[in-house]
């Protein structure tokens, strides 16, 4: 059974539509002296785009299958995942309840009200604030219990949509990448931001099957490699099992020098990467995920950290709405 056939065993809503573009960044390539390509998952078609829509194709389908009328999820005030979950809920006629934290402890009104947070109000989300998402699975379970007691039928969408079911979205993306690359380019490396780990794990499983010679690198955005590796590996293993795969799993490669000072706080390298892509390619990165991941890619070239000098693919997971919340830092 092919990978595509295995995917068809899982209920899926078609939210993404046609394959997102895979483009060469010609001006950046000339600037760096290295072929750089980009997978434009920032332009998925719901609520200003982003990678979570791929996960929600499977998660929301499962919610509908279970008869849910409410999506319950969690994230930071400027969470791209919560924004996309809320939009999908609106599109499907579901309620959405979001448990939010303020991970950087700021009182700046722009951060607290603009960007992704502004969009949650437009999508009519029921927002619940908490001090910190220290045990998000337990906190979401407790919130779902309260929502159910109010007469709703909740479905819990994990932080980032990151579990084995959601990660199927990035197995699907791997199929797109392989089809778009076939006969055109042979990637030596693929770079992606690694946070809640579902996107990274889905690519790890999919690309192992489809582009086994490509080195997949996750640039961490919230924790050290030692802390992040088990998160990726757990979803990778569960995902492979759900797809009936028995081969040894691909090694998880993580670069963790680019997320300081902490999750959700911009740094100089990330902001420099945002400005570089905007000025050379007219493409918008964000200060939490893709800016830091691109900073890793740029430094990786400078420090010769890649396995060879072949073409590099950058997975653009979205996040540009957060730019407005981080002004004037960006």
From Swiss-Prot:
Q: Which InterPro entries match?
A: ACCD_DCysDesulf (IPR027278), D-Cys_desShydrase (IPR005966), D_Cys_desulphydr_bac (IPR023702), TrpB-like_PALP (IPR001926), TrpB-like_PALP_sf (IPR036052)
Identify residues that carry N6-(pyridoxal phosphate)lysine.
Answer: 52
Write out the entry's keywords from A to Z.
Lyase, Pyridoxal phosphate
Question: Quick check: keyword Mitochondrion in the entry?
Answer: no
Indicate the transmembrane segments per the record: none
Q: What is its EC number?
A: 4.4.1.15
Q: Which reaction does it catalyse?
A: D-cysteine + H2O = hydrogen sulfide + pyruvate + NH4(+) + H(+)
Mention one GO molecular function.
D-cysteine desulfhydrase activity
Keyword 4Fe-4S among UniProt keywords = no
Give cofactor(s), names only. pyridoxal 5'-phosphate
Name of the top EC class for this enzyme = lyase
What are the recorded Gene Ontology BP terms? D-amino acid metabolic process
The role this protein plays is: Catalyzes the alpha,beta-elimination reaction of D-cysteine and of several D-cysteine derivatives. It could be a defense mechanism against D-cysteine.
Q: Which HAMAP family match?
A: D_Cys_desulfhydr (MF_01045)
* Protein family (similarity comment): Belongs to the ACC deaminase/D-cysteine desulfhydrase family.
Q: How is the subunit organization of this protein annotated in UniProt?
A: Homodimer.
What name appears for this protein in its UniProt entry?
D-cysteine desulfhydrase
Q: Which organism is it from?
A: Yersinia pestis
Query: Organism classification, top ranks?
Result: Bacteria, Pseudomonadati, Pseudomonadota, Gammaproteobacteria, Enterobacterales
**Gene that this sequence comes from:** dcyD
